[in-house]
Amino acid sequence: MMRDFVSEEKLKLLFEKYYRSTDIDPPALITKREVGFMTFEGEIIRHMHLSNKFELNNMLRTTVPRHVYSSAAYYKKPDEKKMPEKIWEGADLIFDLDSDHLPGAEKMTYEEMLNSIKEQTKRLVNKFLVSDLGISEKDIRIYFSGSRGYHVHVSSEDVYPLGSDARREITDYVSGNSLSISVIDKALKTGEKRPGGWIKDVISKLYELGINAEKISQKQIERAIDQVKSHNATMVDAPVTYDIHRLIRMPQSLHGKSGMMVKEVDLDKFDDFDPLSDAIPKIFLEGDYDINVHEKTRKLRLLDYKIDLPPGRNRVPQYVAIFLVSSGRADFL
């Protein structure tokens, strides 16, 4: 869809207003991370090296990018153009949970999608990372992506050296892809003591269904596996996790398709976090704007404003205008 040039320039000015009013803290070890961004013209700039907070904020205020990223990886030479020459030294363990990937997402409202993916994020952190894998909560950070889901970052000496294969195994585990009839059958036949994780859950489900372990069939095991997976599996975007050179959205930056912040959420406050209120920059709460809505908007909420607009000219709060223009649903007038 072609975007209106004048409207895009207005949106860029509003993004600039945000970056000039906000001191963004760089990710830890910024000197070892590759930094990249996408301009409002669609150009992708990569292989940048920044030394400190001043350089980061100066870059944001002078270039005013639409999207900003930094690498999960740490490099000896992050500004080298060829990956082998960067000299990889390790990487955070990253999980990307996107509500677009949820079953039945096309029938959900935006708010319902975000609520559902939030529950999956809680499950990933509490059940899999902390309980099953023994990762300390102090090494886990949750970020609202700024649009449709959450990013979970794990930073610790235990995960830094993990290669792509080990990271892929972790995604297979949290999504339940590593679970099979043969794995459960073996655990039942060997009488594995104190099974944990998925095996424990499936065996518990078998007992719950009243199935005798001595007369169990593969079909019954498959049924239990399907029920447990449907309740416990977490849908992560696997390539984001196992790609050890991946760029991920930079915390506190604006998402170019929503105008909302990539916002960190404390683990102990995650239940109360409302992205449709808490991720809207305060500087976007001032004033109203005229916009041209392309087609009737699907019902959704931002703060306490119910967006249900007809096509054509509408006057809306600034943050609503930014959201609709950023997502391609409207243009500034």
From Swiss-Prot:
Gene3D superfamilies, per database record: DNA primase, PRIM domain
Gene Ontology BP terms: DNA replication, synthesis of primer
Gene that encodes it: priS
UniProt entry keywords in alphabetical sequence: DNA replication, DNA-directed RNA polymerase, Magnesium, Manganese, Metal-binding, Nucleotidyltransferase, Primosome, Transcription, Transferase
Its job: Catalytic subunit of DNA primase, an RNA polymerase that catalyzes the synthesis of short RNA molecules used as primers for DNA polymerase during DNA replication. The small subunit contains the primase catalytic core and has DNA synthesis activity on its own. Binding to the large subunit stabilizes and modulates the activity, increasing the rate of DNA synthesis while decreasing the length of the DNA fragments, and conferring RNA synthesis capability. The DNA polymerase activity may enable DNA primase to also catalyze primer extension after primer synthesis. May also play a role in DNA repair.
Family according to the record: Belongs to the eukaryotic-type primase small subunit family.
Highest taxon of the lineage: Archaea
Entry GO terms, CC: DNA-directed RNA polymerase complex; primosome complex
EC supergroup of this enzyme: transferase
EC number: 2.7.7.-
Assembly and binders: Heterodimer of a small subunit (PriS) and a large subunit (PriL).
Cofactor entry: Mg(2+); Mn(2+)
Name assigned to this protein: DNA primase small subunit PriS
Example of a GO MF term: DNA-directed RNA polymerase activity
Catalytic machinery residues: D96, D98, D237
Key word Manganese present: yes
